[in-house]
Amino acid sequence: MKIQKIGIITSGGDCGGLNAVVKGTSQMATQKKIQTYAIPNGYAGLYNLLDTESLVELTPKRIDTFSIGLAGSEAGHSRVKISKIKNPKKYERIKDGLKKFGIDALVISGGDDTGSVVEDLDSHGIQCVHAPKTMDLDLMPYSVGGDSTINRIAFFVSELKTTGRTHNRVMIIEVFGRYAGHTAFRGGVAGEADCILIPEIPVDWDEVYRHLKKVYIKRICESDIRAGTYTIVVAEGLKNSSGEPIYDESAGVDTFGHKKLAGAGKYVAQEITKKLSADEDIKLFMEQTGMYVEDLYTIPEVRTITPSHLVRAGTTLAYDANFGMTAGANAVNLLLKGLSGVTVCGNSGKTVYYMETHEAIKQRHVDLDEVTLFEQLGFCFGRVRSSYEPECKKTSGPIERIY
């Protein structure tokens, strides 16, 4: 079947790089004499196409009105999973909606849940290609949004040290990432956090406190004005002592059926506060540094900050802009090769790499050997530091790099 019209869908959470996917898709399609249309409101918009009066065509003039340097999506989002819709004829309804507008294929950008819907649509005869998007970075290939989010986390961690140092506070920053710790890990390192707690590592609270006490006290005692702070970056999917994720039970579930992760930062603050309160050395330290006031100021302040949606908003960083453009463009190329139900993984020159979407959306966790390297550099990851004895290999020619 010759493709004449492509619909573009962005789904799930917003982040940096999505406008680059939209633009890359549209610009490549234009080069191939194919029209592109934005299907608004994610999968909700796809389901409701039959009742939609018109779609916005992404002409060269229209796509010139928005920037790939801005996060978010010109196409709009919703968190709707098609398989959760009760209508038994939902896929027939979607096909009728696509037929109404003459749309032959779809480019769909999103994370694991979005990818699972790509599989469903493909299995029902709807040609579609998945452009990976999630700031959580928990897919097998790189996904749009990751680098932009990591940079924003690093910025917030670094900036919060000024208020932390002014008040000699322990600062806890809780960040997104669901059940993978990539953004907390990389953002925490780049922001020079003292401690980084991720779902992949069960927390040893004694080890966290040992590191905090040593670093915090040393930092303040060595300051000529007795000023210092200690920063902890916490992934939202952190597990409690029984190995269960920490949920905000009052928040319910989202439309994909996931419990809303929340409260990890508060949980860490409670654990730290308990240990500070029970430690006689802390009272002595507070007295020696002129901070102690009976009944009023007996332990260092512990504050929790949740930047929340600020880490997915604002500006798209250069890598996400580049990757998003190529992911969108190559999604078109894959469609033109007759492929469907696959995920764009990247390209090298004129070679486009892809994998089956069911493989691409398998959860990818932090490589703990990478964590071990950073433990040698002084970062605490909530466990006893592991040894790091790398194997060294000689190489030649081009090696993998981001640019």
Predicted regions, residues:
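Short, ordered loop/turn segments at secondary-structure junctions
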Residues: S11-D14, I39-G45, R79-V80, G111-T114, ...
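Glycine-rich oxoanion-binding loops at beta->alpha junctions
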Residues: L49-L106, D113, V144-S158
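Short glycine/serine/threonine-rich phosphate/pyrophosphate-binding segments
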Residues: C15-T25, L46-Y47, P88-E92, L106-E119, ...
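C-terminal non-catalytic interaction/assembly regions of soluble proteins
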Residues: D248-Y403
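Short glycine-rich or small-residue beta-strand-to-loop segments that form or flank ligand, phosphate
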Residues: K5-G13, S73-S78, D104-I108, V170-E174, ...
